[in-house]
Amino acid sequence: LILSLHSPRRRSLILIAAVLAGLFCSANLQSQQDDDVVRVNTDLVILNVTVTDKAGQYVPGLRLADFTILEDGKQIPPELISGFSMHDSPYASVVLLDTSGSMDSRLSLGRSAAIRFLDRLRDEDVAAVYTFGSKVEQLQDFSSSRDLAPTAYGLSAKGMTTLNDAVVDAAKALAARPEKRKAIIVLSDGLDTFSKTSTDKAIETALAIGATIYGVDMSPNDGPRNLRSTAVLKGFAERTGGRFVATPGGQALRDAFTNIADELGHQYTIAYRPANQTRDGKWRKLEVKISRSELEVRTRKAYRAPKG
């Protein structure tokens, strides 16, 4: 049977083929997007908790009995808490350095800050360094080395900004690490302009593996503040229990990285099994309280329950 190109039946077959092709491409795209999310099916919830006094100094010597954990407003009973460790636990971190075109005048400063952070690593800690412009690239893999890779000194600022994709890639890399304390340190001066991933999905991916995000605003001190960019970096930090550092420069930026490294070395880590064992994939609100009212506590605000 030979069909004319212009026959109704031939046109119908072409239309059906086009629809099927579209569905196939859509399924592939959805699969790729699903692959961007780290799936964690463990029932163990890990909280990395920072405790400071009114002067901002880290508070050592607290016991598990000093902490109260609330999930969706309900206290976690002591028998469900399976782990508690203090400052000596190792951490794994990823430094994300923005190398997009707008970072041209700030790239050397960002590199200097990364060097300062690596210099504060303890022997048991590891860090990796990634850059992100129009694409995300690994500059150096996880190690306890305090030296920045020589290729970092040949970096140039160019291209768009893939901040969200960089956070997702960092979370995926950290998911394979055995350390319970995980952190992502972001140095950026602008909004995401080129990622496949949304900001919410990037935060969700970081929360899924228990990573704390520290957002360092690299906008020039003498330039206009980008309020949307600031809000994004603040959101990364606040929702994951990290800190936002506003537009530092020179020594202030290097000090900020020193302080972040010190904070990671002065956290408490608490692991527990939820009383609510429903595997519904829903968000559970988290709150940690401390027995001493003069102290301040910071940790992530939620986690997503496993599904299925």
Mark where each language-model region is:
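N-terminal secretory signal peptides that target proteins for export/translocation
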Residues: 1-10
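Intrinsic low-complexity/disordered segments
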Residues: 3, 27-30
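Generic N-terminal leader/processing signal
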Residues: 9-12, 26, 180
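Short amphipathic alpha-helical "recognition" segments used for binding
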Residues: 12-14, 47
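Bacterial N-terminal signal peptides
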Residues: 14-26
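Scaffold/interface architecture of coatomer-like assemblies
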Residues: 29-308
